[in-house]
Amino acid sequence: MRIIYVADIHGAFDRVKTLLSETVADVYIIAGDLIDIPFYNMSTAINYHELQSYFHGLRVRMQKESMVIEDFVDELLNTPNISEEIEEKGTKYQQYTIRARRVLQQKYKVLENILAMKQKSQIFALPGNYDMDLKYTSLHERDLHLRWHDMRGLKVAGYGGANIWTPGIPERYVVPYGGSADVESGHNEMYNFFKAIKPDIIVSHQPAHGIHDRIYQFGTSGSSALRYYCDNNPVLLCLTGHVHMDWGFQISEETIYLNPSNFGEVTTLTGGVAEGGFFYTIEMEGRHVSKIIFKKLVEDRIHDIADYNPQKSGHRQETIVDNERYKALK
């Protein structure tokens, strides 16, 4: 069985269409972030972001950080004697939020139409922190969040979202991240789900703690619960994303971790542009991973960057094919 795994497409739907037309695989897994902005033009997105930041600051000052911003705004507008400024901005924010939901659903419909063209392959999708809950979209049948699917006898399950506030995305519609609680508390939604399902392959937008989770100038950002589960259960593959710069292949406690970096073009934390196009091809023989190839899509051509053989040990696992493109990522 051949699996193609991509993450963080950030609205690059044309690139996804090219990938599907230029590759052959039994299964495609497309992990969040699927969307870039919840509007059709940047000026509207900027206006929405500014209003959201305004109410976020007000929410902090009023010690109501536990409330979703949209609920906070609704409550404010029902409060007697609010200022004209708050009423005007709040009403506009409500209108933008309704529009954002409509645009998001339209964009997911476009993506679903593209994925539906590949009828002979299984294609799954996972929401990231830029996405709304996919169960309310055209992608609901492909959704991996808190769901599992059978892939030729292997069980794949996913957990989406991330433990971060994402400005510019309506909080009301995103997947609430329930993977932060201590495992021993019994209230970690992600851990409890995986413990009940016992998946062979895990897809998680947020990486595991200490593996592909380092953010420039901030340090590690991964999920301790995900790492704990994989370390103590027979997980073949843990496929993650979210942290674009800490990509790679790593094996820990017999689990193979993969982060392909971003597939869609993104702006980096340092202000540069990461053009993306990266993905993994994973070859499976029964329950064994026989080979992994790290690749890059450039326009309509696919370039092999590195091969990985999990059966070998140490540095022998990796063979660099395209030294120039490989070094450009380091």
What label would you give each PLM region?
Residues 10-15, 35-39, 126-136, 164-169, ...:
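Active-site environment of divalent metal-dependent phosphoester hydrolases
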Residues 152-199, 219-225:
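Binuclear metal-dependent hydrolase catalytic cores centered on His/Asp/Glu-rich metal-binding motifs
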Residues 8, 28, 33, 128, ...:
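Divalent metal-coordination and catalytic microenvironments
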Residues 6, 13-151:
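Core catalytic region of metal-dependent phosphoesterases/phosphodiesterases
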Residues 122-125, 141, 215-285:
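Conserved beta-sheet core of the metallophosphoesterase superfamily
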Residues 215, 284-330:
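A short C-terminal boundary segment appended to hydrolase-like catalytic domains
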Residues 1-4, 148-158, 197-201, 251-257, ...:
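Beta-strand-turn-beta hairpins that frame and shape the catalytic cleft
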Residues 86-104, 108, 112, 198-234:
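Active-site-proximal segments of metal-dependent phosphoesterases and phosphodiesterases across multiple
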